[in-house]
């Protein structure tokens, strides 16, 4: 099944973007070629841009504290797997402590480093990091891969608590949902939400159908419409019945 996820609010939308950026960063950092490490570094700059929002850290701390207070009363409950509960609570408490230790504006260390700041300013220009534009950066790219990797990992280190916090919030949100099998009649599906507030919607479709879900929602109703794309033309609405799995997640 192919999984599509749709955020219902700006906070979850930001966390999904961060998750995608951190996954891209980890993939390219693990490679050997300097061009791949260039992608890792520019992704680091993107992460700094997203995490530089003043209220992101406080939002994550408030959400983790809320989850801690929700889960802590289940300690000693015989109906709850205690080892799993303690693992989650320990992870939340450690991440909260790491967030509390973060000093200043997120990503400020990249701004304060003049060399990295010069690379960052050139990286937004198409072709702006050529060797004649940034000879010192080109020289750094000739260093051994492991040394480059250590440098980039060092520059990422101050932002890792935000990565961990985002991962916990998204995991708890995803685990809160119950999947149901539904059918989009003639490619369209709608469902009343009865005033319930959801954070995230997941749509899973069989890959052999080659359909693409488009979703929208408000506090009363959600809609899922399926399209299909042939080649490089704009996707068109389908008029066939489409079976899919729908999961609504609410922290």
From Swiss-Prot:
Q: Which UniProt keywords apply?
A: Cell cycle, Cell division, Cytoplasm, Septation
InterPro entries recorded: ZapD (IPR009777), ZapD_C (IPR027462), ZapD_sf (IPR036268)
Query: Any idea what this protein is called?
Result: Cell division protein ZapD
User: What do the Gene Ontology cellular component annotations say?
Assistant: cell division site; cytoplasm
In which domain of life is the source organism classified?
Bacteria
> Where does it reside?
Cytoplasm
Purpose: Cell division factor that enhances FtsZ-ring assembly. Directly interacts with FtsZ and promotes bundling of FtsZ protofilaments, with a reduction in FtsZ GTPase activity.
Q: Name one GO biological process term.
A: division septum assembly
Q: Which family does the entry's similarity section mention?
A: Belongs to the ZapD family.
Quaternary structure, per UniProt, is: Interacts with FtsZ.
For the keyword DNA damage, the answer is no
């Amino acid at each position: 099944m192919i999984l599509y996820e749709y955020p219902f609010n700006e906070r979850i939308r930001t966390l999904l973007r961060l998750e995608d950026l951190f996954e891209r960063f980890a993939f390219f950092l693990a490679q050997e070629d300097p061009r791949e490490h260039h992608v890792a570094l520019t992704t680091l700059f993107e992460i700094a841009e997203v995490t530089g929002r003043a209220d992101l850290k406080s939002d994550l701390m408030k959400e983790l504290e809320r989850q801690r207070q929700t889960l802590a009363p289940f300690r000693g409950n015989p109906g709850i797997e205690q080892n799993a509960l303690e693992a989650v609570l320990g992870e939340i408490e450690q991440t909260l402590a790491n967030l509390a230790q973060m000093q200043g504006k997120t990503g400020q260390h990249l701004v304060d480093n003049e060399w990295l700041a010069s690379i960052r300013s050139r990286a937004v220009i198409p072709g702006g990091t050529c060797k004649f534009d940034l000879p010192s950066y080109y020289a750094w790219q000739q260093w051994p891969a492991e040394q480059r990797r250590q440098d980039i990992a060092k520059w990422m280190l101050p932002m890792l608590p935000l990565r961990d916090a985002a991962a916990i919030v998204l995991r708890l949100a995803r685990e809160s949902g119950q999947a149901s099998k539904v059918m989009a009649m003639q490619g369209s599906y709608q469902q009343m939400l009865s005033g319930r507030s959801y954070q995230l919607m997941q749509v899973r479709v069989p890959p052999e159908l080659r359909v693409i879900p488009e979703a929208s929602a408000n506090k009363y109703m959600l809609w899922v419409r399926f399209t299909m794309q042939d080649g490089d033309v704009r996707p068109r609405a389908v008029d066939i019945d489409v079976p899919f799995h729908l999961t609504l997640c609410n922290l």
